């Protein structure tokens, strides 16, 4: 901490993670919090959602604007990695040095938006099946009512990706990986308290360890 440059590189990611945790508690509009809590409090569906919530750092339980995390961006990155070798234009672009990498990164960001919108809609449908939106036909005439929810969740993903890139540029390490890991760490106390990891079936613990080690190795 005596070196100003190093101190800034360490403190900046911490500040951005504080912002991330704040955003994770900002709910999307139009949510019945009592119904959401009831679904998470019990039943097999609640356990499934609780496991998914582990990787969002509590954002799914709050159905916050950060409920999707940065996973749409991860999906977009994987898609681009698969497309570059098979599309001649992208393959040529990848060989143009920094300019090509910037263009591919830009395309990755563009693809992230529709993926986030689709995943946001899918997540809301999943919660409807769990009983949170029983009074609303999300596929019928009431569909416009959930448009603000979907847009806010997609916007949350875009914001988190931006935070991750700021951490990468101005901090230490890969910002996207740090945000994912921070989300997992933030969800651990609640998962342990609920006894998820302490169950006789060790599948949950093994899965958690494997995913955590994968993220750290990125």
Task: Please name every model-derived segment.
Residues 1-94, 98-218:
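N-terminal cationic and glycine-rich segments that engage phosphates or anionic surfaces
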């Amino acid at each position: 901490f005596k070196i100003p440059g190093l101190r800034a590189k360490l403190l900046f990611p911490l500040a951005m993670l504080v912002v991330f945790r704040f955003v994770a508690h900002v709910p999307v509009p139009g949510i019945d919090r009592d119904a959401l809590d009831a679904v998470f409090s019990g039943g097999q569906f609640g356990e499934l959602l609780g496991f998914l919530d582990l990787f969002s750092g509590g954002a799914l339980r709050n159905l916050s604007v950060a409920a999707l995390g940065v996973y749409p961006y991860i999906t977009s990155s994987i898609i681009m990695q698969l497309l570059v070798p098979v599309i001649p234009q992208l393959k040529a672009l990848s060989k143009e040095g920094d300019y090509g990498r910037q263009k591919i990164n830009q395309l990755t960001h563009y693809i992230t938006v529709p993926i986030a919108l689709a995943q946001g809609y899918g997540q809301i449908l999943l919660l409807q099946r769990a009983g949170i939106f029983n009074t609303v036909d999300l596929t019928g005439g009431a569909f416009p009512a959930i448009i603000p929810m979907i847009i806010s969740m997609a916007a949350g993903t875009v914001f988190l990706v931006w935070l991750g890139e700021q951490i990468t540029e101005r901090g230490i390490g890969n910002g996207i990986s740090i945000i994912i890991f921070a989300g997992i760490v933030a969800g651990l106390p609640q998962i342990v308290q609920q006894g998820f990891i302490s169950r006789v079936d060790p599948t949950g613990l093994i899965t958690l360890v494997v995913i955590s080690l994968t993220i750290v190795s990125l």
